[in-house]
Each structure stands twice: as structure tokens, then as C-alpha cells.
């Protein structure tokens, strides 16, 4: 489980960096170009299968571990004071993972499935694209980020992801035997930083579009100057 988890951490970094194209003020050209490349490049398409297997195996391992832990508790002491012997995140990894899984299903259907198989994004415009035959996935993202319940689900999933990474990053290295008095504190703080940066980066996207842009992704006129300056920096 540690290997698949650390592998998926690499995917999260790549996915986050790519999605930062959403903040470019080019009417979605950069993001649509990036999405088109990721969906058509044969090397990326091959790597996708490894990613699918990685997610599938990680989820399978999580359910298996949850069942084993439940069985162990049922044969153990009635009161083992688990709240004193373990962190909150480790006791609730199943709940956090379930929230992430629900979000992942909705997220994949809303974007990946529609773009790759349903073919219902081409009607969403394209006048602002340099290459007209691309699906305008940018407008699909902006449209989704103006739906309040989807924004809430997205942000809740990123909070869950942050806690999940917070615990999993350090535990992954420990499981691999990389546990040393000198390096473990460093791994711990790197894991904290990684969890916060990744989850905050993803959560900022729906919040930005929901709070500060119109239905076309253009920044509203009443946006504070500081936020406008930060977004324009991308």
C-alpha cells in the first residue's frame, strides 16, 4: 500500500501543476491545450493504465486493511483506548478515503468520462481557442465550479486528502523501512508541507472560480485588487 500511495503522490503533483493552467487569463487556451495533450499523447495514454492499476490496487489494499483491522479489534480487548494509542487521522483513514473515493467517482464522470467517451463537451464553445477542434474542457470546469454542491464536495474531498496525505506520507516511508532517528522528523515535516500544499492548491481552484469569476471564467469587476494581482501572476 505504501508503494502505490507514494506513486499516487507523484500523480497528484503532476495533476496539480497541470491544473494550475486554469488560472491563466487566456480564456482557457492553455488548459485546453494541456488537456488535449494529456488525452491524445500515446505515452500519456499508456501511463494512464498504470495509474488506473495504481488507484485500483491502492483502494483494494485499503479495504483489505480495513477488514483486517476490524477483525483484529473484534478479537481484542473490549476497551483498548485507541483514541490514546493512535492519531485521529490513522483511526479515520477509512472515512477519509471513502470521501475521496466518492469525490473521485463524481470527478472522473464529470470530466474524464465526458471528455473521453461521452463526447458532449464539443458544444461548449471554442471561439476563444487557438485550435478550434479541441473540446472546451475549460468551460466544463468553470461551469462545474459554479455549482455550490460540487464546490462543497470538492473542498471537503481536498480536506480529506490533506489529512490522508498527512498520515500516509510518513507511514509510507516507515512501511518501506525508511525509519531513522535522524531522518524521520524531516520526513514528517516534508509530509506535512506536501499535504498542505497539494490539498490547498486543489481546493483553491473551485473556490476561486465560484467566488471571483463569472460563468465564462472571467474575473468579476468587484474582485479585490490583491486577489486579482495574485491570479494575474499565473
Show which residues each predicted segment covers.
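Membrane-embedded alpha-helical bundles that constitute the cytochrome b-like, heme-associated redox core
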Residues: 1-234
Amino acid at each position: 500500500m505504501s508503494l502505490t500511495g507514494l506513486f499516487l503522490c507523484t500523480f497528484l503533483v503532476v495533476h496539480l501543476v497541470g491544473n494550475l493552467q486554469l488560472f491563466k487569463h487566456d480564456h482557457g487556451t492553455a488548459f485546453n491545450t494541456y488537456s488535449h495533450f494529456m488525452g491524445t499523447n500515446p505515452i500519456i495514454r499508456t501511463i494512464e493504465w498504470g495509474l488506473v492499476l495504481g488507484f485500483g490496487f491502492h483502494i483494494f489494499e485499503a479495504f483489505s486493511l480495513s477488514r483486517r483491522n476490524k477483525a483484529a479489534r473484534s478479537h481484542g480487548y473490549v476497551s483498548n483506548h485507541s483514541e490514546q494509542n493512535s492519531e485521529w487521522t490513522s483511526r479515520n483513514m477509512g472515512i477519509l478515503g471513502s470521501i475521496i473515493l466518492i469525490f473521485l467517482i463524481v470527478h472522473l464522470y464529470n470530466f474524464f468520462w465526458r471528455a473521453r467517451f461521452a463526447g458532449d463537451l464539443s458544444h461548449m464553445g471554442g471561439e476563444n481557442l487557438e485550435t478550434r477542434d479541441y473540446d472546451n474542457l475549460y468551460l466544463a470546469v468553470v461551469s462545474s465550479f459554479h455549482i455550490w454542491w460540487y464546490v462543497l464536495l470538492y473542498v471537503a474531498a481536498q480536506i480529506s486528502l490533506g489529512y490522508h496525505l498527512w498520515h500516509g506520507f510518513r507511514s509510507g516511508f516507515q512501511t518501506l523501512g525508511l525509519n531513522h532517528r535522524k531522518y524521520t522528523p524531516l520526513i514528517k515535516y516534508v509530509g506535512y508541507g506536501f499535504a498542505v500544499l497539494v490539498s490547498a492548491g486543489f481546493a483553491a481552484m473551485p473556490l476561486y472560480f465560484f467566488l471571483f469569476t463569472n460563468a465564462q471564467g472571467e474575473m468579476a469587476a468587484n474582485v479585490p485588487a490583491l486577489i486579482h494581482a495574485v491570479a494575474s501572476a499565473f
